[in-house]
């Protein structure tokens, strides 16, 4: 029932802290949630029998006004990776290429391959900055998207 090509992807293995080394890449913090967060979660739990309102319409309206852009130019999600994955999945086809500097966000190659496209990883400069010349040189007729992360700029 599932696409057989998806079987080649590795299972996610969460990182673990080791002794005095703390793994920060899992986006976990050592402290429990603040009491105000727990109270908000408790209130929200009482509404889990209802469909959520998709798209955060109030936030979208306010951001649209603040930024001076049309509402349909905004995408709201719980994290940037959801938006990146959806954008790649909606725009890429088998045989397309997506360029991004490497080393970068570990999920980029997975998102690209899940869409049926091929990742094209370009090198960073010696000081781990965006190698813009390498990105430009990698552009071909098959290039469908280029992902640039602010961390490298």
Labelled PLM ranges:
Residues 1-50, 148:
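N-terminal "arm"/small-domain region of PLP-dependent enzymes with the aminotransferase-like
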Residues 56-97:
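Phosphate-binding glycine-rich loop
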Residues 117-144:
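PLP-dependent aminotransferase-class I/II
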Residues 151-153:
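Conserved small/polar residues in nucleotide/adenosyl-binding loops
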């Amino acid at each position: 029932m599932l696409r057989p090509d998806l079987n080649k992807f590795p299972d996610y293995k969460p990182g673990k802290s080791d002794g005095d080394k703390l793994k920060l890449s899992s986006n976990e913090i050592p402290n429990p949630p603040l009491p105000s967060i727990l109270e908000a979660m408790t209130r929200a739990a009482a509404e889990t029998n209802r469909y959520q309102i998709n798209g955060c319409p109030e936030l979208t309206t306010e951001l649209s006004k603040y930024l001076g852009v049309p509402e349909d130019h905004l995408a709201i999600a719980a994290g940037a990776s959801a938006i990146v994955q959806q954008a790649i999945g909606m725009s890429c086809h088998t045989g397309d290429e997506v360029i991004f500097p490497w080393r970068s966000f570990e999920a980029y190659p997975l998102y690209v391959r899940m869409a049926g496209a091929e990742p094209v990883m370009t090198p960073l400069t010696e000081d781990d900055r965006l190698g813009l010349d390498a990105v430009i040189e990698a552009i071909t007729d098959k290039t469908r998207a280029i992902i640039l992360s602010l961390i490298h700029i």
